[in-house]
Regions:
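Non-heme di-metal
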Residues: 2-190
Length: 190
């Protein structure tokens, strides 16, 4: 099962059913991290709203995955026959990051550090897996909405890095992530 990924394995095609629960758990942990940031920056209204929006968007990803789960429950053959590309090391890396960052966020963290953590998490390729899983739904509108929301989130992240930090390297990472995701998701849509 994907939960206990072997880091030596290469990206592979795996069934939607096998990866769905893992994706749900990682999205929940990502949402929880952003909620920690919401609390950490509650005194700065614009930052609080931004982090709450990021958490809310992770919740919408969970809703999309629940829709995938509903499709699979109503047509189990789809869950067994539909496959997505999956790299087991993505799960191991992201789970480790989320655990470490969750502990770190319990303490006082800087705005720069929160943005750095978010860029690391958003760079994990999990969102690509979520978009791939949405192919099971067979509604282009649902996939398009997920892609637009992801690009919007990353663009907002880049904007906030620029507005609240003077860290050019961090801004360059955020901008590169937006461009990478835009290119990757635009190709995947066609």
């Amino acid at each position: 099962m994907a939960e206990r990924a072997d880091l030596r394995r290469r990206p592979q095609r795996t069934t939607v059913k096998d990866i769905l629960r893992t994706a749900v758990n990682l999205e929940k942990k990502t949402m929880a991290l952003y909620m920690q940031f919401t609390r950490a920056f509650q005194a700065q209204e614009e930052l609080r709203k931004f982090w709450f929006g990021m958490a809310r968007h992770e919740a919408s990803h969970l809703g999309a995955l629940a829709l995938v789960e509903g499709v699979i429950e109503n047509d189990p053959d789809v869950g067994e026959s539909s496959k997505v590309w999956f790299d087991p090391s993505t799960v191991v890396r992201l789970r480790s990051l989320l655990n470490v960052y969750g502990r770190e966020a319990r303490e006082k963290i800087s705005v720069e550090r929160a943005f750095e953590m978010a860029i690391d998490v958003e760079s994990s390729e999990l969102e690509d897996v979520v978009v791939d899983l949405l192919h099971v739904v067979r509604e282009q509108m649902v996939r398009d909405q997920a892609v637009k929301l992801l690009i919007h989130d990353l663009s907002d992240l880049s904007y906030m890095v620029e507005k609240f930090t003077n860290d050019e390297a961090l801004l360059a990472r955020a901008d590169a992530l937006v461009e990478h995701r835009f290119d990757a998701l635009s190709i995947a849509r066609h």
